[in-house]
From Swiss-Prot:
Its EC number is 2.3.2.23. Belongs to the ubiquitin-conjugating enzyme family. This is Ubiquitin-conjugating enzyme E2 G1. It comes from Macaca fascicularis. It comes from the Eukaryota. It is an enzyme of class 2 (transferase). GO terms for biological process: protein K48-linked ubiquitination; protein K63-linked ubiquitination.
């Protein structure tokens, strides 16, 4: 896939999301002149600890998208087993295609060129509702989620939700 084809695909996906918004998130370009860097706002899913949160993240697409997955990084602080302390999201759908050298993921769960920004965001929203404790990016958050979900983990998430509400539209 050429860079031009990649850019056209990203432009089409952005136009589709603006024309037919998907519940739970919105997306736009960080810079109108750069189709490869997007900003997304994710609304914490109802009936989860993240409910009411407004979390800002960036998606950075490779020039050969969709052959390779984008990278996603939360800009808003978030306490979650599958988000490392730098904000980088670690879920299967964002991992390079092919075999997992550690044997945790099946190839069909990893990146496939048929995925879109919409499928990525639906996966991230699902991740917020149901963390994967077996493959954590934040070991401390995963430990708290397993051992003290309604105690320390819940308090840290609540603090992140409050902070996200205060800084959502800065």
């Amino acid at each position: 896939m050429t860079e031009l084809q990649s850019a056209l695909l990203l432009r089409r996906q952005l136009a589709e999301l603006n024309k037919n918004p998907v519940e739970g998130f919105s997306a736009g370009l960080i810079d109108d002149n750069d189709l490869y860097r997007w900003e997304v706002l994710i609304i914490g899913p109802p009936d989860t600890l993240y409910e009411g949160g407004v979390f800002k993240a960036h998606l950075t697409f490779p020039k050969d998208y969709p052959l390779r997955p984008p990278k996603m990084k939360f800009i808003t602080e978030i306490w979650h087993p599958n988000v490392d302390k730098n904000g980088d999201v670690c879920i299967s759908i964002l991992h390079e295609p092919g075999e997992d050298k550690y044997g945790y993921e099946k190839p069909e769960g990893r990146w496939l060129p048929i995925h879109t920004v919409e499928t990525i965001m639906i996966s991230v929203i699902s991740m917020l509702a149901d963390p994967n404790g077996d493959s954590p990016a934040n070991v401390d958050a995963a430990k708290e989620w397993r051992e003290d979900r309604n105690g320390e983990f819940k308090r840290k998430v609540a603090r992140c939700v409050r902070k996200s509400q205060e800084t959502a539209f800065e």
